[in-house]
């Protein structure tokens, strides 16, 4: 087929890799919601979803059908355009954040030299979705939830970014593939242990997951910024939250635990196993920790996480300068 030039083949392969990887991410996010409900039932000594299909295996299909057929209701005095745009931005930004994660050698949607900066930019874009949802709903609980979420996310993104600077300094690159290759002998979690701890805490907070789910606190805010959403608009917020968990888990693996590297098994299998482990940690955290007050969450971030990241960065810089002499 002479019309298939090498450039066209390269473009088609890139599109194929992007479609496969992003479909897998969406599927993992959807199945994590089912697995979380089953595991929470086990932890709380009750049954999880077990009626639809064998052992509840078709619960996701039932939920999807329900979402499609629920009324797509928009509040009377809301800003209809922004109200509709918010869940799309939330879903798309969190999905695109995964594009810079290499799942195995050569399998990455966008192998950018500024990969970490791209991730931070997408994480910052998700804040706009929350603000748009809260403001456009014309609901006081939505607005309060959006204000909480934006303040919490912007604060913890500072710690998230600073915790990555030590990894960048050690690898000498913002490229995710270069960072994975730099861990061929020692995983970054050993020299960057405090950076990993801060990144994990900030990652949970940025995803608005328990115990940092104050923006969605049912007892105080009646489900927060997406209280007025229903149908597939709510579904986009819901799936987007789990895609964020998959992305943060994959970044923990890539930045601190050697990415796809491991003995005996294929690289993709190692990456999937490590990522699944951290996804499980999100569920265990939700099952075991109480929700603190909002002021305690913000105080913890600025008084503990920020000094910890700065100390980690200063020590890393000092060690690199000492080794260069």
From Swiss-Prot:
InterPro entries: NADH_UbQ_OxRdtase_su1/FPO (IPR001694), NADH_UbQ_OxRdtase_su1_CS (IPR018086). It is a multi-pass membrane protein. It comes from the Bacteria. The keyword NAD applies. Keywords: Cell inner membrane, Cell membrane, Membrane, NAD, Quinone, Translocase, Transmembrane, Transmembrane helix, Ubiquinone. GO terms for biological process: aerobic respiration. It is found in: Cell inner membrane. The chain crosses the membrane at residues 11-31, 81-101, 114-134, 154-174, 186-206, 237-257, 265-285, 304-324. NCBIfam families: PRK06076.1-1, PRK06076.1-2. Belongs to the complex I subunit 1 family. NDH-1 is composed of 13 different subunits. Subunits NuoA, H, J, K, L, M, N constitute the membrane sector of the complex. PANTHER family: NADH DEHYDROGENASE SUBUNIT 1 (PTHR11432), NADH-UBIQUINONE OXIDOREDUCTASE CHAIN 1 (PTHR11432:SF3). This is NADH-quinone oxidoreductase subunit H. The gene is nuoH.
């Amino acid at each position: 087929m002479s019309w298939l030039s090498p450039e066209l083949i390269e473009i088609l392969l890139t599109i194929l890799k992007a479609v496969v990887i992003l479909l897998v991410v969406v599927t993992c996010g959807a199945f994590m919601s089912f697995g979380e409900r089953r595991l929470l039932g086990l932890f709380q000594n009750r049954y999880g979803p077990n009626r639809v299909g064998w052992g509840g295996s078709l619960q996701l299909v039932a939920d999807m059908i329900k979402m499609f057929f629920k009324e797509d209701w928009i509040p009377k005095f809301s800003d209809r355009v922004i109200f509709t745009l918010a869940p799309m931005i939330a879903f798309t930004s969190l999905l695109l954040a995964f594009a810079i994660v290499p799942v195995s050698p050569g399998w990455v949607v966008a192998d950018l030299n500024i990969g970490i900066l791209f991730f931070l930019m997408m994480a910052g874009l998700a804040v706009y979705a929350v603000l748009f949802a809260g403001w456009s709903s014309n609901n006081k609980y939505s607005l309060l939830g959006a204000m909480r979420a934006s303040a919490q996310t912007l604060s913890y993104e500072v710690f998230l970014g600073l915790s990555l600077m030590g990894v960048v300094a050690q690898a000498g690159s913002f490229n995710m593939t270069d960072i994975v290759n730099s861990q061929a002998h020692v995983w970054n979690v050993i020299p960057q242990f405090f950076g990993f701890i801060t990144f994990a805490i900030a990652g949970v907070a940025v995803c608005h997951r328990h115990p940092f789910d104050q923006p969605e606190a049912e007892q105080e805010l009646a489900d927060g910024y997406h209280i007025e959403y229903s149908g597939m608009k709510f579904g986009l917020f819901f799936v987007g939250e789990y895609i964020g968990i998959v992305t943060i888990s994959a970044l923990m693996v890539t930045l601190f635990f050697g990415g796809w590297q491991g003995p005996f098994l294929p690289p993709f299998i190692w990456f999937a196993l490590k990522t699944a482990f951290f996804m499980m940690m999100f569920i265990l955290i939700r099952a075991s920790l109480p929700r603190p007050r909002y002021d305690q969450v913000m105080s913890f971030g600025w008084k503990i996480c920020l000094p910890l990241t700065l100390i980690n960065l200063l020590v890393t810089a000092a060690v690199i300068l000492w080794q260069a002499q």
